[in-house]
Amino acid sequence: MTLNIKATDFCDASNSAEGVIKAINELQSGDTLIFPKNEYHFYKDRCIHKVCHMTNTDSFKAPDKYFAVLIENKENITVDGCGSTLVIHGDMCAFSLRGCKNVRLVNFTVRYASPTNFEMEVVERSLNKITYKIPTGSAFEVKNNKLTFFEKSPFSGENYYTYTANGECYCNVIHRGDEVFRTSRSPTKIALKIKKTGAHTVECRYFMSPKFKVGDVVAMSRNKLRDNCGLFFESCSDIFCERITVNYMHGFGWLSQMCENLSFDKLTFKPASGYRVSSFADLIHVCGCKGYVKITDSHFEHPHDDAINVHGAFLRFRKACDERTAEL
């Protein structure tokens, strides 16, 4: 007998992580996990975490990965979002399949409450002063002449992440109308004085203002650390994804590694309103997979790296099990 298992039978949409884990544990072959249309909020300090390796990330520096939704070792299941949005709070992976076979993921949106690319829009400019507007979802403070971005847990009061724009943000991209280009210029590193002038504005004073224009949006990577990815498939086969919208992904985009037969149809990678960047790095990233990878009828917009990246991988050789088998 197959069942439709509703996430709302196990969780409150305002704090979904622990209840969704219980719902996933109930899934059997042929079942569908349904998210009745709503916004489902996932907070990092309420989510599951495991040590695992993700290619192209700093897994040695950050081996412990946090997951908003983690489905492991399930076969012949469907996850139907019914148009829902998964809202991610914290620098973690939004959705992961590990060791799964014949899974359909359909009709949901992934949105990060506070993206980890930091954006500053030029709203006023003079010879030695620029005022920048920061999106409403990005919390920040100015202290000791340093601009710091952060996201705070509502449970512990501790920050999920804290990054200082003056020193840590190293890769700057300017969005100017339909143009997007990389620049070595920084809104903060050469600032003589940084002052918070409103709930969402900062003023930077310079010896000579950078040659930004009013309307430019400067997008900054928080630092070089790729400690996780936005969505993650590992050792899975026959996975079908359809009508999924991604507003942003932390870490390293939508990563599939050591998988077989993947289909991506009608995906939309588009920043949420008020933002310009849809991913900290790549959008779809495929490593060490076999069979087919089909990407059809999809829209890709403004990642901070590649839209699609497919490659093999160097793996660590651990030991020879026999003449034909190695442990990697």
Can you describe what each PLM-predicted range is?
Residues 21-26, 41-78, 87-106, 114-128, ...:
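Extracellular beta-strand-rich solenoid/capping regions of secreted or surface-exposed proteins
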Residues 160-235, 240-242, 247:
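Long, low-complexity, polar/charged, intrinsically disordered or flexibly structured peripheral segments
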